[in-house]
Amino acid sequence: MPVVQFSDKDIDELITVPKYLPADYRSRLRTRARSYSDKHEEGQLEIDVQDKGTFRVIIRKNRINPLDFSAILGYIPPERTRVFRLRRYNGIHKHTNKIERNSFRAFHIHYATQRYQEAGWDIDAYAEITDRYTTIDGAWELLLDECNFIRPEAEKIQPKML
């Protein structure tokens, strides 16, 4: 029987816990070439939340195809090293939800779920089509907004550029 790491309630609590962004978060999330891949660039940012663990935002994009990207919210529990993906905001590629047996090729968001863990699939194997972004920048801005990241005070006073 598969081991369930997080219940749906646990996942919801992790998504809604306030995560305070440092003043330099945008520069830290800027993607850069990585030695392990000549096709992708990646940026990462870790935020420690007292008594909860570490949250990691990962921005990954293809150097050639602008529709091939992911903005990921990972979670590392205290005393652990494994990253659990709680949300994944993806570009366009084919995805199949194994339990529902439906496939699509579109922008989509992966959600960590208890039932996919119980079925033995990846924690974030379930996904839904979205029209709330069309670029990597739009995807990670949505991730920050939906997953309760608190922006620095200086940024809050500035109007958001569209």
Predicted regions, residues:
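Charge-rich, low-complexity N-terminal segments
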Residues: 1-64
